[in-house]
C-alpha cells in the first residue's frame, strides 16, 4: 500500500488549513514518519524502498503468508510544501520517501493544485529535476491541467496517480480528462480509483449532498475503473486508490461502506 505524509504550507490570508512555515510542515511529516516506523517496529508494517524488497514482500504474501504478516508500504508525500529546500529532498529520500505529488489543494510552493490554476513554480521545476535524479516516482494526482502537461514534458521517470477518477464521468478539475488518462497510460502509470463520493458521482455539493440521494455505492467506482480499462485496452493500469484516510467520514463515502 501507499503510506502518506502530508502537511501544507499556507501564506497569511490563505483560508486552507496548514502551517505558516515550511519548516513546521516538515516537522509534521516527520511525526507521521515516526508513526509508520513505530508500526514497523511492532511488526505490523514493512517499508519497501527498492525493487528487491518489493519482490521479496510480494512473494511473502503470495505463498501462504502467516496471519500476522506485515503490510508492505511505499512512503509517499502528498503535496511537496514540506520540502523546505532541495537539500531536504535528499534527507527525505534517505528515510525511504519514494514518491511525491507536488500539488494538493490550492496554491502550493511547488505547484498549484485542486481549486487553483497555473503551472509549476520555478522551485517546482527544480524539484522535478531532483526527483528525476533520485528516481523518486511522480504522483500526478491533484495537479492542475497546466502543471500536469508541463511536468509531463520535463519529467520522464516513473509516474502514477494515487487517487484519481475520470472527468468524463464526473466533470471537475480534480478529475483527469481522457487526454490526461491516455498520457498516464502511455507512461505505463497505475491509476488508483478514489472512493471520495463527490469524485464518484456528478453533481455532488459538499456539506449538502448525501450518498443516499445519489445512490452512490461501492460498485459505482467500477464505472471509473472500467472507463480507464476501455481507454487502455487492459486492466494493468487500474488500482484501488481509496483516499479513505480519515479526512472525512461516511457522510462523504459510498452508502454501503460501513467502516
Locate each region found by the language model:
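N-terminal hydrophobic targeting/anchoring segments and the immediately downstream early-domain regions
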Residues: 1-118, 122, 171-259
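Alpha-helix-loop-beta-strand connector modules within alpha/beta enzyme cores
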Residues: 29, 119-134, 151-161
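Short, well-ordered alpha-helical microsegments
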Residues: 85, 146-149
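Glycine-enriched alpha-helix->loop->beta-strand junction motifs that scaffold or abut catalytic
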Residues: 97-99, 134-136, 154-160, 186-190
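Catalytic beta/alpha-barrel core
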Residues: 136-143
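Histidine-centered catalytic micro-motifs
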Residues: 143, 161-164
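Short, catalytically relevant binding-site loops at active-site mouths
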Residues: 145-146, 166-168, 197-200
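Charged catalytic cores and adjacent phosphate/nucleic-acid-binding surfaces used
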Residues: 155, 166-167, 252
Amino acid at each position: 500500500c501507499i503510506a502518506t505524509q502530508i502537511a501544507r504550507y499556507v501564506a497569511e490570508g490563505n483560508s486552507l488549513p496548514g502551517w505558516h512555515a515550511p519548516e513546521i510542515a516538515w516537522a509534521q511529516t516527520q511525526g507521521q514518519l515516526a508513526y509508520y516506523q513505530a508500526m514497523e517496529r511492532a511488526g505490523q508494517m514493512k517499508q519497501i524502498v527498492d525493487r528487491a524488497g518489493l519482490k521479496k514482500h510480494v512473494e511473502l504474501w503470495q505463498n501462504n503468508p502467516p496471519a500476522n504478516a506485515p503490510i508492505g508500504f511505499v512512503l509517499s508525500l502528498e503535496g511537496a510544501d514540506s520540502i523546505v529546500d532541495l537539500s531536504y529532498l535528499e534527507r527525505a529520500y534517505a528515510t525511504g520517501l519514494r514518491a511525491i505529488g507536488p500539488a494538493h489543494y490550492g496554491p502550493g510552493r511547488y505547484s498549484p493544485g485542486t481549486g487553483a490554476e497555473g503551472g509549476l513554480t520555478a522551485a517546482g521545476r527544480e524539484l522535478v529535476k531532483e526527483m528525476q535524479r533520485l528516481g523518486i516516482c511522480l504522483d500526478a494526482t491533484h495537479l492542475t491541467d497546466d502543471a500536469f502537461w508541463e511536468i509531463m514534458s520535463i519529467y520522464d521517470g516513473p509516474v502514477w496517480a494515487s487517487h484519481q477518477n475520470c472527468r468524463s464521468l464526473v466533470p471537475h478539475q480534480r478529475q483527469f480528462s481522457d487526454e490526461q488518462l491516455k498520457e498516464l497510460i502511455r507512461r505505463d502509470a497505475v491509476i488508483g480509483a478514489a472512493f471520495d463520493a463527490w469524485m464518484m458521482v456528478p453533481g455532488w455539493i459538499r456539506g449538502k449532498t448525501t450518498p443516499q440521494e445519489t445512490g452512490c455505492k461501492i460498485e459505482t467506482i467500477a464505472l471509473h475503473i472500467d472507463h480507464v480499462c476501455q481507454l487502455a485496452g487492459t486492466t494493468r493500469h487500474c488500482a484501488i486508490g481509496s483516499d479513505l484516510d480519515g479526512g472525512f467520514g461516511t457522510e462523504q463515502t459510498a452508502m454501503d461502506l460501513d467502516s
